[in-house]
A protein has these predicted regions:
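Walker B catalytic acidic pair
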Residues: 90
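Active-site-proximal or metal-binding-adjacent scaffold patches in catalytic folds
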Residues: 1-85, 94-127
Length: 127
């Protein structure tokens, strides 16, 4: 209820429809995920430099050495508790650019159930 997507025009052309849908999803992701990332960043006092939305095949997100966070537009289709965990995970990479014990300790200080959430992400392709 509330939001709907209507495709019109040359809908017989599958690639045109696919491109329109991907553009719409990316725009929606930008509208919802980037403000959420800023909010969690502020809440946890973990600043980042820049953020973008991408269509990634194998990653939910990434963080560069310049503290630029990229989020996968497909996060829109995950339950909110998993998205929040991914936001925390990527924000912790602004401190530790690896998956060291220090990194996981930092993640755990913000999200004690991170192991269970990380396991849940293995099945996230089902969403």
């Amino acid at each position: 209820p509330g939001s709907q997507l209507v495709l019109f025009g040359e809908t017989a052309h599958r690639e045109v429809c696919k491109a329109a849908l991907q553009k719409w999803i990316t725009r929606k992701a930008r509208m919802h995920l980037l403000p959420w990332l800023r909010s969690v960043s502020h809440e946890l006092h973990l600043p980042f430099e820049d953020a973008s939305i991408r269509r990634q095949k194998t990653r939910w997100g990434s963080c560069s050495a310049t503290k630029t966070i990229s989020l996968n537009c497909k996060l829109l289709f995950l339950p909110s508790h998993l998205v929040r965990y991914i936001l925390i995970h990527e924000l912790c990479h602004t401190i530790h650019l690896n998956h060291s014990r220090q990194f996981w300790s930092l993640v755990g200080s913000y999200e004690p159930d991170y192991r269970q959430l990380d396991d849940s992400l293995r099945d996230a392709r089902l969403y």
